[in-house]
């Protein structure tokens, strides 16, 4: 018998997360490691599981995430986006709740590129009038 699973892809900054939801106890595995080990910051982990709280499905699904690119924050954001999309597969009625909380929206903010002649994207050397 094939195991029921739901998939979703999330993106944030330079990170891409491929998320699989499997009915279970609520443990999260990221790139083969537990989420507590993979992302050391509790506040970022809490943001990551926000879709479960909004849809009241906390502890009902095990989450398997394959994520690459970016840092902790981007990867957690991509995972959150992927979980929200996977929950849509679980029940299309979740769309209204997820959309109103902004969890289905791809956060388009990216790092601004460095410009030639400047030290960073906007940081210039000190201006001297004379």
From Swiss-Prot:
Keywords recorded for this protein, A-Z: Ribonucleoprotein, Ribosomal protein
Gene Ontology MF terms in the entry: RNA binding; structural constituent of ribosome
Region Disordered, annotated ranges: 107-130
Record's keyword annotation contains Ribosomal protein: yes
InterPro entries, sorted: Ribosomal_Su5_D2-typ_SF (IPR020568), Ribosomal_uS9 (IPR000754), Ribosomal_uS9_bac/plastid (IPR023035), Ribosomal_uS9_CS (IPR020574), Ribsml_uS5_D2-typ_fold_subgr (IPR014721)
Entry's Gene Ontology BP terms: translation
Domain of life assignment: Bacteria
Signal peptide coordinates: none
Transmembrane segments: none
GO cellular component annotations of the record: cytosolic small ribosomal subunit
Record bears the keyword Isomerase: no
Stretches with biased composition (Basic residues): 111-130
NCBIfam families the UniProt entry points to: PRK00132.1
Annotated family: Belongs to the universal ribosomal protein uS9 family.
Protein name (record): Small ribosomal subunit protein uS9
Species whose genome carries this gene: Ligilactobacillus salivarius (strain UCC118) (Lactobacillus salivarius)
UniProt lineage: Bacteria, Bacillati, Bacillota, Bacilli, Lactobacillales
Gene: rpsI
């Amino acid at each position: 018998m094939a195991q029921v699973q739901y998939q979703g892809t999330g993106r944030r900054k330079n990170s891409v997360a491929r998320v699989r939801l499997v009915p279970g106890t609520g443990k999260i595995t990221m790139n083969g490691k537990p989420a507590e080990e993979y992302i050391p910051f509790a506040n970022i982990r809490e943001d990551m599981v926000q879709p479960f709280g909004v849809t009241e499905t906390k502890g009902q699904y095990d989450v398997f995430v394959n994520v690459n690119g970016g840092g902790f924050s981007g990867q957690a954001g991509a995972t959150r986006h992927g979980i929200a999309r996977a929950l849509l597969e679980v029940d299309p009625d979740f769309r209204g709740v997820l959309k109103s909380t902004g969890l289905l929206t791809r956060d388009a903010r990216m790092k601004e590129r460095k410009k030639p002649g400047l030290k960073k994207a906007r940081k210039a050397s000190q201006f001297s009038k004379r």
